[in-house]
Design a protein with these regions (language model features):
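Conserved ASCE/P-loop NTPase catalytic core
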Residues: 27
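Conserved P-loop NTPase motor cores
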Residues: 1-13, 31-160
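Intrinsic disorder/low-complexity signal
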Residues: 15, 23, 33, 50, ...
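P-loop NTPase motor core of the ASCE superfamily
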Residues: 77, 81, 95, 145-200
């Protein structure tokens, strides 16, 4: 399905979801090859034996004509998996190698994971280390901010990190977004933040 909501997490369910994504990717690639083969046939170009065998899978027995393959998707299928509020559940238990392994390999499945938690440390370190982005909403826990800055933003001092955080979250519902690939910090999605040198 193009979208699905599951109430409970299990490794088996995630495995099924990822397998379905893998099948969709393979179907897309095979259909792309079949379309090229069909077009080659329609131009009366010479076909290999393997191509002829594949072409006959497109033969419509009712019309005795070759049906042009049609893509199910308009482009290579990508997937977003949202893991919401799983802190304290078996999904995040220490040593859940399955979930960590899937997240590590997610790019091969053209999949992005969005992990939403009430507190960053509800998510195991192994998963946190895989994050390319982090969105932090308002908190008064200065110790947490200091730990997060040391763990994730080595290009900023803890003081700079906290200054940016205070600026980014000064309005209700605003958040600080850290892009670890670019070493970039934003207020919400569109305002890139910079540290200004203090004037003497």
């Amino acid at each position: 399905p193009l979208s699905a909501v599951h109430e409970d997490y299990s490794d088996e369910l995630l495995s099924d979801v990822m397998e379905e994504q893998k099948d969709d990717m393979e179907d897309y690639e095979q259909t792309a090859l079949d379309i090229k083969l069909y077009e080659k046939f329609m131009k009366h170009k010479r076909l290999t034996k393997a191509e002829l065998l594949r072409l006959y899978t497109m033969l419509n027995p009712l019309t005795e004509e070759f049906d042009k393959p049609v893509q199910q998707f308009d482009k290579v299928p990508y997937m977003a998996v949202i893991l919401d509020d799983l802190g304290g559940t078996p999904a995040f238990r220490n040593g859940n190698n399955f979930l960590n392994s899937i997240v590590c390999k997610s790019r091969h499945y053209k999949t992005n994971f969005f992990v939403c938690v009430q507190h960053p440390y509800q998510m195991p370190r192994a998963l946190r280390s895989q994050c390319s982005h982090c969105m932090l909403f308002s908190t008064k826990d200065k110790k947490l901010l200091e730990e997060l800055s040391k763990e994730n933003c080595s290009h900023l001092t803890p003081e700079e990190f906290q200054r940016m955080f205070q600026h980014a979250t000064k309005e209700p519902h605003d958040f600080m977004m850290c892009d670890f690939r670019r070493n970039e910090v934003r207020r919400n999605f569109d305002e890139v933040l910079h540290i200004c040198a203090d004037s003497d």
